[in-house]
């Protein structure tokens, strides 16, 4: 199937033209018999160094199939992939954000992986990407959302400290927010991180919707959002979510990157595991509680899935490409990933070897939360559109739009996209 047959979601014509030239001028690197690898880590020197160390070691052991790397800034990466697909210049190996994988597989960019069954089985579910019954991507790590709270504030209010075994209920969470909001030394009870953009809103707030009993789409066949995104349970979620801001418990315009929490303006912060160490450095490890998500009635959930590796459908040497991915997924490199960027390894055997996730490690609670509550975003090629539509709907709800009609329109828009793409059927 031609890789240009279907539209790459989110790629503009100008970006295609610009990025084709950029990629073509830098592409290549394997030479005769070699394989090419593209990554989004051009602006992340620590993660890029881990990948480069694996490439160097692999190339020493496999001189006939050396890997050549191209690193792009994350903001330009997806456009680069889309442009390369249009021009027929996809690399052999590419990394991708987990929820994007079904769209790229459906569009013909990716081939199913042929890694060993032993490795596949050893990887946690949230770091594996399946579509249409086949494994297309695996990731070296994942992270988790969590609630960060000041121990001193929680103790002052006297509210129960939730655990993975017994998360807060909605009533308990609402009570805790009310008590925290009454503390005069803080401006708001919680920073909900609404200043963040991109994929954050679906990643962070759809799990709350799902805990209420709604969802982004019917996950049985991904054929409709009606009755899920606009269900009574979804309306209840929207009503509660907006009340956080309308009732003055959270700011609609918080500082970016958790600065309100770090500067002592709020006692609680809805964030990811990547903010734990900075928070502990600011206040001390004992003062920062890492708390699980709230159970709003249908189980507690957090978003799952991070960056993963796949093999392009046009690879001239898929055997070597899969072999490199297996090499990169060894414990040695999973530990390096974890120590470099703070995420937990996707294979259990690597965890005790890490600095932060071993028993008693500063980030051990983050992995515990992720393992207990991670829910992958819908594995459908239409997810990119679903994500964008939900993002807009949630923002509109916070800004005061009618909740039921906003969710009705969002469900209609998602269903229209599904129909327009013939149900995103595999061919």
For the regions a protein language model found, what residue spans apply to each?
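Periplasmic-binding protein-like
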Residues: 50, 151, 326-346
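Extracytoplasmic/periplasmic substrate-binding proteins
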Residues: 40, 101, 203-207, 235-317, ...
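Conserved N-terminal structural module of periplasmic/extracytoplasmic solute-binding proteins
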Residues: 2-102, 109, 297-298, 319-320, ...
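Short helix-initiation/N-cap motifs at beta->coil->alpha
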Residues: 71-80, 99, 168-172, 251-263
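Alpha-to-beta junction loops
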Residues: 85-96, 186-187, 263-271
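Glycine-centered hinge/linker elements that transmit conformational signals in sensory
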Residues: 174-181, 215, 219-252
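Long, aromatic- and glycine/proline-rich binding clefts that accommodate carbohydrate-like moieties
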Residues: 288, 339-392, 423-427
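Hinge/lid segment of periplasmic solute-binding proteins
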Residues: 96-146, 201-204, 208, 289-291, ...
């Amino acid at each position: 199937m031609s890789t240009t047959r279907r539209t790459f979601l989110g790629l503009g014509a100008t970006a295609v033209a610009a990025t084709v030239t950029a990629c073509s001028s830098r592409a290549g690197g394997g030479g005769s018999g070699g394989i090419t690898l593209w990554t989004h880590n051009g602006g992340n020197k620590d993660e890029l160094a881990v990948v480069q160390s694996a490439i160097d070691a692999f190339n020493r052991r496999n001189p006939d199939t050396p890997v050549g790397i191209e690193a792009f800034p994350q903001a330009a990466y997806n456009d680069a992939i889309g442009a390369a697909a249009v021009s027929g210049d996809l690399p052999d190996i590419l990394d991708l954000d987990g929820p994007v994988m079904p769209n790229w597989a459906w569009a013909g960019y990716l081939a199913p992986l042929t890694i060993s069954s032993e490795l596949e089985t050893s990887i946690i579910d949230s770091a594996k990407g399946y579509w249409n019954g086949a494994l297309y991507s695996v990731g070296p790590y994942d992270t988790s959302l969590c609630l960060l709270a000041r121990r001193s504030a929680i103790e002052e209010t006297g509210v129960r400290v939730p655990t993975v075994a017994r998360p807060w209920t909605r009533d308990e969470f609402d009570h805790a927010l009310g008590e925290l909001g009454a503390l005069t030394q803080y401006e708001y009870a919680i920073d909900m991180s609404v200043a963040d953009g991109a994929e954050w809103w679906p990643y962070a707030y759809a799990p709350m919707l799902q805990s209420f009993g709604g969802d982004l789409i019917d996950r049985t066949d991904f054929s409709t959002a009606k009755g899920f995104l606009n269900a009574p349970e979804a309306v209840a979620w929207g009503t509660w979510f907006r009340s956080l801001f309308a009732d003055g418990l959270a700011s609609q315009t918080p500082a970016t990157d958790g600065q309100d929490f770090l500067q002592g303006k709020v006692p609680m912060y809805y964030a990811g595991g990547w903010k734990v160490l900075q928070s502990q450095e600011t206040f001390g490890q004992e003062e920062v509680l890492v708390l699980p998500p709230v159970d709003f009635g249908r189980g507690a959930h957090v978003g799952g899935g991070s960056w993963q590796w796949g093999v392009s459908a046009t690879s001239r040497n898929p055997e070597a490409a899969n072999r490199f991915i297996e090499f990169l997924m060894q414990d040695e490199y999973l530990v390096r990933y974890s120590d470099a960027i703070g995420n937990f390894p996707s294979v259990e055997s690597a965890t005790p070897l890490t600095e932060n996730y071993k028993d008693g490690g500063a980030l051990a609670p983050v992995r515990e939360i992720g393992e207990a509550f991670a829910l992958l975003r819908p594995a459908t090629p239409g997810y990119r559109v679903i994500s964008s539509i939900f993002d807009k709907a949630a923002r509109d709800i916070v800004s005061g739009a009618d909740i039921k009609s906003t969710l009705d329109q969002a469900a209609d828009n998602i269903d229209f996209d599904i129909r327009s793409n013939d149900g995103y059927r595999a061919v």
